[in-house]
Amino acid sequence: PSPCANPEEIAGAFDELRRRGLVRRFGVSNFPVPKFRMLQSYLAEPLLTNQVEASPLHLNAFDDGTIDLALRMRIRPMVWSPLAGGRLFDTQDARSVRVAEALRAVGAPQGEERLDVLALAWLMAHPASIMPVVGSGNPARLRAAAEAVRVKFSEADWISVYAASQGHEVP
């Protein structure tokens, strides 16, 4: 969001679009927690979502309060770049390799080895009910992404991937 964004103007535009029946609900993208709260304070209706970057290699939203705020407000965050822009598949990067091994350790007993499916399943297993945004229009990739719903992560499984990404155990 622009540092000069006027929340009254944004709220007015949202209200007008809703009044005219052009939209039912609104969400925002890449709003840090303070800006999200500030905009929400001007709106008559609650925001539906905040679309943010997150993946097993990009944990900021889990650590900066973004996902915590979504849980508190009972909204489902959307996540862009759920495969870290392809970095998840980098076999030369130590962090990517650790994360891939942790994901496959969870997926193997369930018959799943594909990193894209496992990364999406990991995101969706979070208590915030994260909705990954899959940037592909390729039908085969979309079918694979849909298969992520069948892969289950326990809390311990989820934390094992998070810890692999951080490079140390989670206290």
Report each predicted region and the residues it spans:
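Beta/alpha (TIM)-barrel catalytic core signal, keyed to glycine-rich beta->alpha loops juxtaposed to Asp/Glu
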Residues: 1-171
